[in-house]
Amino acid sequence: IIKVAGKQSWLSEVLRTPEDWQLLREARCPVWLLNASRQPIDKVIAAVSTLDESPEHSTLGDRVIVQAEALAASLKVPLQVVAVIPDWNASRAAMAYVPPIPAQTVYLGDIGAQALQESRERLVAILERLDIDAEKAEVRTGTLTLEIIDAVGDQGLLVIGSAAHRGLAGKFIGNSSEKVLHHLKADMLVVH
């Protein structure tokens, strides 16, 4: 499905589920949402999660990367595979109580560095399994929406997966693709 992305106010999104979100949740095929500008695509960004290791998310991540690689090859533009993990030093989690571990001192900075390293290793392993150059991997720390939007820029094409939360979870939690869509200025392909 190819559709021009609609823009709505934040209040409108709270009061009623936007049509684009409904389409992303219900479609059984990939959905390509076009931005209003007609600028040529200069790169393809595959956004995947390295934090959720469930079989469903792993399969979805593989589909996202394979689809993004095919698009980058056909458009003759670079491919970049991006994962985002929370910034432990800047998040509210950094102020949370960390229970002591016997005979060990725990530093949140160390936890963040370890999470970043593990995320990089997972992403490289995924790319190697899919026979894609590991140099295309990038793990960012920060807020998912802001980091993805920064990676894509104004002329990129974002390829992202949607596991489609439904019901109250969909209303209050939402999906990463929906959160990014609200702020993205570039095209987005959502893979299910």
Give the label of every model feature segment.
Residues I1-I2, K7-L11, A125-L158, S162, ...:
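Structural beta-alpha unit
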Residues K3, L33, A46, V81-A83, ...:
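Structural beta-sheet core signal
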Residues R25, A73, D150-G153, H182:
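Solvent-exposed polar/charged
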Residues I65, A113-V124:
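Short, surface-exposed alpha-helical segments at coil->helix boundaries
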